[in-house]
Amino acid sequence: MTLKDLKIGKSAVIKTVGGKGALRQHFLDMGMIPGAEVTVVKFAPMGDPMELQVHGYELTLRLAEAEQIEIEQIPRRSNSHKRIEALSDAAHPGLGEEGKYHSKKDEHPLPEDTMLTYALVGNQNCGKTTLFNQLTGSNQHVGNFPGVTVDRKTGTIKGHPNTEITDLPGIYSMSPYSSEEIVSRNFVLESKPKAIINIVDATNIERNLYLTMQLLEMDIPMVVALNMMDEVVGNQGSIDVNMMEALLGVPVIPISAAKNEGVDELVKHALHIAKYQERPLRQDFCDKNDHEGSVHRCIHAVMHLIEDHAVQADIPARFAATKAIEGDPLVLEKLKLDTNESEMLEHIVQQMETERQVDRSAAIADMRFDFIERLCEQTVVKPKESKERIRSEKIDRLLTGKYTAIPCFIGIMVLVFYLTFNVIGAWLQSLLEMGIDKVSELADAALTAAHVNSAMHSLVIDGIFTGVGSVLSFLPIIVTLFFFLSLMEDSGYIARVAFVMDKLLRKIGLSGRSIVPMLIGFGCTVPAVMATRTLTSERDRKMTILLTPFMSCTAKLPIYSFFVSSFFPKKGGLIMAGLYLLGILVGILVAFLYNGTLFKGDPVPFVMELPNYRLPGAKNVTQLLWEKAKDFLQRAFSVILLATMVVWFLQSFDLHLNLVKDSSDSILALVAGCLAPVFKPLGLGDWRICTALISGFMAKESVVSTLEVLFAGSITSVLTPLAAASLLAFSLLYTPCVAAIASVKRELGGRWAAFVVLWQCTIAWIVAWVVHLIGGIW
């Protein structure tokens, strides 16, 4: 019987885990080990993937992968374990000990001027970035779906200028399954931080401690931060922190990063262990009596075999030994074992597999989870089912229900766009437009009264105020849309969207996880491209990056709003929704093309944790809105202002730098006129349109400011509604801005970046031509 056959609400014990390579290792690291109890929670609305509960947390798995896991419906192995021996030197500090948690006899403090570097390491979605913000005073974005942090972020602990802490991407283990796991592991191994701050989700402690055990093997000073302890206590649970310290051999500090509780004590311990280089007191988790000591003997034999190589490779021996047993290719490559040593390693491991009756990777994973179970038996009083879990289950009945999930998703997105473009955003925009017009009138009157030179007067009023002012008026719409996207992300709903949409996305060759970067793409392409780093497959990552530009970013909203209000004022909401749907439809068609040509093959398995729903924090939402508004304003008064001034100059002077009365005689008309024939079949042969589209490569908002400057408010008398529709279609799909292209170049290289520019322009031209052709027939 396989896991695929298990019914909803039924439990079973895992017998064997099939598959191979990094994916199988990832399953084991996530707790899908022989002997583990697993329960089916539900299936996605379309029957695939499935949601499981294992080791007290929920994760998703496709039926194709579940079919590789054999189960048996028998009682789980006894939870009666041999107690772990406590380490007497690891007692929790008493009052006033200032972070000194064990014997000082071997202390050798680092010089006072030493830079104390820290790696902040933890599972995805455990509160790492929230803690990082509390420690440093930074305002990094915080979300409630796995994979928010996709790059390293560095800061200084408040009040301690000689410190540097790096927030690493969230990982489940130190196995090289995904790019962020490789980034985090390489940072710890190669950058050699003075200490590690390991943040652990106390509400999901068994799964989180799996990473802790691997970090302890790396023999780096470490402090464990038990986050979300307020939720544990609130749900009538408890953790014996003193005992946990004694069993792990490192300081364990209960904290609530969201409430800034316990953070000061954490800082004291972190400073102390780094300064005195107090390394973990326990790195050996194998029981010499477990299964007649087969794993114990194997690990210690391998440690002796590779010890010299580990020293030369600068890898901790214990960590290198367990990774060598697992067959980790990156570690084995660094160890540089000769043929005889490799054969001896294989012989030792095969002997262990024969005695243990499971394969090497499963044996190591089982050793770790067995230790974790014994640790939790002695230290953790599990809370009753949390309020957050109960609330999430009730909400999920509607938002992930078989018949309600997709209608709810469509309804939520329609509501978001309606409120953004027809209610809240539109009302705020009209208020801001009135204010900008009033300021422009006052500036015009002041310049006239001061008898300012006509050219300078034109630059300020017709250039800066008309151009930049028109872009600024769209700030409320952009902020409103980001507000709703932030609510969806912080609440945990976006992770559910990935779960619900996985089967649909698989039909175009993608994984459900790709929905996250694509939804972010509706806000901005730059972070959307970066968010693809959470995808484990290079094929999926490239394909998602190339599809992200088809998701219309908020920078294009000013273009849509400008043309809709000018040409289709009574059909604003309908046309806006139509543009977004057109972008998605074209993206789907292109995905089919990619899947059959450039990126043949199957999408990677869908293994993802579903976090509990949480109420979005007002501080986090406000912070995100401020960041987006600030970014928009900076662009408006830098790139867009510069582009507006350049456009004004080029359309005001001829090649002899004489002020022209007719802009058709200007430098700009001469240059843009060369491109006009390309756009003529689209009904966009006017050189001013070409100029606006070129300026949009710098920043999409510049299209509107350029049109305002060049047409001086008379665009409706020049373009027809059909030409406006064609221009909207082209603006929707043509090349992203230079910042987005730079992010594509950083992720995929220059050739792919150039491909995106040319490909998007080609697609945009074809779609705009079709729109113009169909519109002409009607």
Language-model segment annotations:
Residues F550, T554-A577, A739-G749, V770-W778:
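Transmembrane helix-loop junctions at the membrane interface of multipass transporters and ion channels
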Residues E355, A362-D366, K382, V423-I464, ...:
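Extended, low-charge hydrophobic alpha-helical regions
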Residues H160, R185-V252, I559:
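Conserved C-terminal guanine-recognition region of P-loop GTPase G domains, centered on the G4
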Residues H92-S173:
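Conserved G1/Walker A P-loop phosphate-binding module
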Residues G249, Y276, Q283-N453, L659-L668:
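Extended helical scaffolds that flank P-loop GTPase cores
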Residues M434, K438-L442, A495-T525, K600-L624, ...:
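Juxtamembrane inter-helical linkers in multi-pass membrane proteins
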Residues V232-F285:
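Canonical P-loop GTPase G-domain recognition
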Residues C408-L419, L481-S486, V564-S566, L579-L593, ...:
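Hydrophobic core segments of alpha-helical transmembrane domains in multi-pass membrane transport
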